[in-house]
A protein has these predicted regions:
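Intrinsically disordered or low-complexity boundary/linker segments at protein termini
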Residues: 1-15, 124-165, 264-283
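Small/aliphatic-rich secondary-structure junction motif
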Residues: 1-47, 149-194, 205-210
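Ordered, small/hydrophobic-rich secondary-structure cores
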Residues: 2, 21-103, 107
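Short secondary-structure boundary segments
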Residues: 38, 104-105, 134-135, 184, ...
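Short, surface-exposed alpha-helical segments at coil->helix boundaries
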Residues: 50, 54-62, 167, 193-204
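Structural beta-alpha unit
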Residues: 69-100, 138-140, 209-241, 246-249, ...
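Hydrophobic alpha-helical segments and helix pairs
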Residues: 93-144
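Glycine-rich, Arg-bearing micro-motifs that act as flexible, cationic patches
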Residues: 103-121, 242-264, 279
Length: 283
């Protein structure tokens, strides 16, 4: 597998990239090649006073490259200019990445970028499965909050085609997964022709065949609020969820349950986009 690893060269990015456990988790799910990417915002110029950005970025990426190569990955580096989330998506398509990784928070001293906003924009537009790696928000030397990325997964499903696609990610995530919680939230407006518990049990049976300890949860109420409440309760290392298959413009305007989860989850989030966006099959 091939991954895009987006960094703003902040202390938070240092924490995520230099964490051996996180890198081991990526290796366990099959990642062999990593494309390290940093984006120079369009409004930042090399000639600005006190900013030798190009050289500092190259040094930063080379340091990260050394860490990742030492961990056994093949590594390429990219420095590009533009809007971060757009360029991350563009490079992901160009190199035919299987997933992208981005830190959830991290103020960059180089570009004055808050990577959290990039993560949220990627949640709306990502063209490949996106791992939002949660790092401590307010610390001089931040740490990854839940470093065993895929050890305990929370999978949120509405039994849609896109949720089914997201569940397909277990085909490779299972190699690093020990426990899973499957949650479905029934909303007042929902009219399902199937039995939620029966459907969750079928999914649990599949995971059981892979020796993953699984529990199921059914809630009533607002999907975003209930999923985040379950996340707070069971404390998964990562929440797995599919994004809605709406038009890109509509997603940008309205937001979605998946965006709320990306914004509000305490742990990591793995977001799987619709097939027509991702351009390849997981199942």
């Amino acid at each position: 597998m091939r991954a895009i690893y987006a960094t703003d060269l902040s202390a938070a990015s240092d924490a995520a990239i230099e964490n051996e456990t996180c890198l081991d988790c990526l290796e366990r799910i099959g990642v062999e090649e990593i494309h390290l990417l940093t984006v120079v915002p369009s409004n930042v110029h090399a000639g600005m006073p006190g900013m030798d950005l190009e050289e500092r970025r190259e040094r930063g990426l080379e340091a990260y490259r050394s860490v990742m190569e030492e961990a056994g990955f093949r590594v390429e580096t990219h420095i590009v200019r533009g809007t971060p989330y757009r360029r991350i998506n563009g490079v992901a398509e160009t190199v035919r990445a299987d997933l992208a990784v981005v830190g959830s928070r991290g103020q960059s001293p180089l570009a004055n970028r808050v990577i959290g906003s990039t993560a949220r924009n990627l949640a709306r537009t990502t063209v490949v499965p996106l791992l939002v790696n949660r790092v401590e928000r307010e610390a001089d030397e931040p740490e990854v909050i839940r470093e065993h990325l895929f050890q305990r997964l929370l999978f949120a499903t509405d039994f849609s085609e896109n949720a089914e696609r997201a569940f397909g990610a277990f085909n490779y995530l299972r190699h690093a997964t020990e426990e899973a919680t499957l949650v479905h939230v029934q909303s007042p407006k929902e009219e399902l022709e199937l039995d939620p518990q029966s459907e969750l049990d079928k999914l649990a049976d599949t995971l059981g065949q892979w020796d993953i300890d699984t529990q199921t949860v059914i809630r009533d109420g607002d999907p975003s609020e209930e999923i985040l409440d379950v996340e707070e309760s069971v404390k998964p290392t990562t929440t797995l969820i599919g994004s809605r298959g709406r038009s890109r413009l509509r997603r940008l305007m309205l937001g979605s349950v998946s965006e709320d989860v990306v914004a509000g989850a305490k742990g990591n989030v793995y977001l799987v986009p619709p097939a027509r966006t991702a351009g390849y099959n997981l199942l």
